[in-house]
Amino acid sequence: YEISLGLVGSEMCIRDSSMTRIPAEDEAVTAPSPPLDNALAQLSAAVKTLGYDEGLHQMLAAPRREMAVSIPLRRDDGSTEVLRGYRVQHNFSRGPAKGGVRFSLDVDLDEVRALAMWMTWKCALLDVPYGGAKGGVTIDPRQYSKAELERITRRYTSEIQPIIGPEVDIPAPDVGTDEQTMAWMMDTYSVNVGHTTLGVVTGKPVSLGGSLGRASATSAGVVHVALAALEHLGIEPSQATAAVQGFGKVGAGTVELLEAAGVKVVAVSDQYGAVRDDEGLHYDALQKQLWDTGSVKDTPGTASMDADELLEMDVDLVVPAAVQSVLTEENAPRVRARLVVEGANGPTTGEADRILAEKGVLVVPDILANAGGVIVSYFEWVQANQAYWWSREEVDERLKQRMVAAWKAVLATSESRRVSLREAATLTAVQRVAEAHRT
């Protein structure tokens, strides 16, 4: 069914898609966006391998609920514009929906549908009791003042409030949003319901019920999986070399934690350039250079290098932790690392994936490798519901347990079915959601 509600100064559409079906091949439909096309193709392949019937396939593919809202904004200069926002809840079979809110010009309904589906699989793979959701507003946040972003966030929260809540759908930060955004969302929701509700979002400041360890969780998850994969390959951390593409939140944290684990990080890049030191780079020096100049480029005691060559270095481990589609059909044949751990979302194209598999390069997919943030978001939600907060050591240890358990499950599926880790991760996740639905 569909419901349209006319609101003062706004528009809201809620669509319950539990009965939505995938169009037949001969039906005329609007072509899906590439992310949604990829998500549906991955699901179809998993369903075929698992031998599920078409009815279950339809259930797994269809978003459970979709919402599109109009957000009137009065700019600081007095002008008014109307923005578009979305929230898609893909699946509730394993628990309330969970997923980020992004502020980006790329946000549209098809992208949000795809990201919500991928969140369902990620939560299931990590054995976190959530379904998948995603949301966002179609803006470039750099073009708005802090006051304007607050107004956008608060109005967006009020509009999607009918379908979110600590037992229904729990938003979190994503591209273009941060802990301040989550603080505004939590405050707006709490004011609207009449009481403080810490568990309505995760990724909040620690002072408002956020979890210790949340800021570094994604990087920590990357490193936990990387160390487990190195062990699987028979490589001691103290003997391993690594190259990390990206020195943002994920990349910088990965460099710091790899160094602490004894791995020699010999190359690092950011959007402005790359540096190398075959004797090993040091996180503190890179971070100081970043603070002083805005880039790791020209860090004292290092040599400059072509950033494009970083992914092709003769190292044990490569961590793409910047942007998507950096490992391609063109450069994959030149990759010499034995292990690629995807810290970024979608850094490896399908063509590159096939080439790396043929070369015997082990690729740990993003759905597993960068899932640490989702796990600690779950921990934050649990702590908020209990009104009891864990120590940093407890958070770190429980994160490690979850990441290693997920790695072992994916590896076991990969070996038993003789498929790549990426295929194994999707199969494991889809199977868990299907079992929950059918139980």
Map each language-model feature to its residues.
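Short, small-residue-biased leader/transition segments that mark boundaries at the very start
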Residues: 1-14
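Glycine/serine-rich phosphate-binding loop and adjoining beta1-alpha1 elements at the start
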Residues: 104, 124-238
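Glycine-rich, N-terminal phosphate-binding loop and its surrounding beta-alpha-beta segment
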Residues: 69-141
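Glycine-rich phosphate/diphosphate-binding loop of Rossmann-like nucleotide-binding domains
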Residues: 210-312
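Short, Gly/Pro- and small/polar-rich lid/capping loops
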Residues: 30-70
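Rossmann-like adenosine-cofactor binding region
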Residues: 273-363
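Adenosine-phosphate binding glycine-rich loop
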Residues: 30, 229-230, 334-439
